Amino acid sequence: MSDMNHHTIDIAEITDVEKSDKEADFEITDNFERFNQKNDVFRRSWWDANIRSEKSRIFYASYRKPLKNWRQADGFTQKDYAFRNATWHVSDLFTEMKENEDRREGFSDAFPLYRDVAKEKTHFDSPKAAADEIKNIAKRFGADIVGITQYDERWLYTQKFSDMSLTERPNDIPDGLKYVIVTAQKMDYDLISTVPSALSGAATGLGYSHDATVVLSVAQYLRNLGYNAVASMNDSSLNIPMAIQAGLGEYGRHGLLITKEFGPRVRLGKIYTDLPMALDKPLHFGVKEFCGICRGCTKGCPVKAISDGAPTTQTYNQSNIKGIKKWTVNGEKCFGYWAAQNSDCSVCIRVCPYNKDYSKWLYQLGRWLAGTRLRRFMLTLDIKLGYGKRKQPKLWWQGQRQNFNNFIRNFFSSGKQKKNNQKLR
């Protein structure tokens, strides 16, 4: 349990916003505006004529019913779509459960209270003891990373938006929930390696289905202890700034959270609660500095939606939050590619040098180098070893998985090949 809480502090309120932002490396400007969920690019794809199209309609429909014509391209066959859609099934059950009430839980609405809060409360010896127990329980339920932060209204949507009735409505997170438990679930490395493909979308579906069970289970555990709790996925608020405040990782050039354990290959969930717990400090391991010299995601993005410049307050369109100096992604270009491909895209995750299996010593060394002045050497080494290349989906179906030794062989074989080429000259 000790390594789980190495960056924990016993503070229950934001007593100094400026200090809190500095710790999280947030640069908030005077023209900051909270975000309206209606402007999220996925919500816009339902009401905004600039985003909504026949392709976007088919894109969404393909997750619920078969396409009329299957593509023959590797990774886009009926089998690939069948697997992708099956991985979404658990998440879809919750999302569709109350559609007749104009609710899409987990995406437009937080999950409701399925069981009452116990009348008698379980008390803990200290906020740290409470945090330790909740983190342990969350991991038992399947969370891969867990952090705790304070409720920060700046990240809450000003309004929620219904994809079905196309109407705005109040954000109904109950008052008094001052603590947020943020969870991260890793996505499958080998599936992500096949992107772009419908097959790779299974990594996303597995992540969301897993996420739903984790946040619902943790929330119910808290209710059973006598504390109010609300489970949430993409609904109600922006996940990434909360995850950064909770110490799960740093912000990357591609606009994603980069964790120390899995890089950007995670799905995020959260639970709002009134159980007093020790909070986690933001984590820094050199991501901002490394992303400053790396352009892997910028070069890899098929539609050039990722900036190659320095962090800025510039926004591309209404789907970007205003008033924060950071790297910003053009969501309109990004979603347009999703709709055109008829499946979600994770190329920026696949090519990211932080997308590794850190149970291996070599990758741990590389992560350490990325946080030092030797980061350029690490980047060169990463490219030399051939990381981030696309795997043919048919190889995944044949059972081929990530092989650590192959990368080592590639490194030395490429060196030998170079020497042989020089001799031929």
How does the language model describe each region?
Residues 96-121, 252-281, 397, 401:
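Amphipathic repeat-derived elements
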Residues 1-191, 197:
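Non-catalytic, usually N-terminal nucleic-acid engagement modules in DNA/RNA processing proteins
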Residues 2-36, 309-425:
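Flanking helices and flexible, charged tails adjoining ferredoxin-like Fe-S electron-transfer domains
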Residues 124, 135, 141-356, 364-371:
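Catalytic cores of enzyme domains
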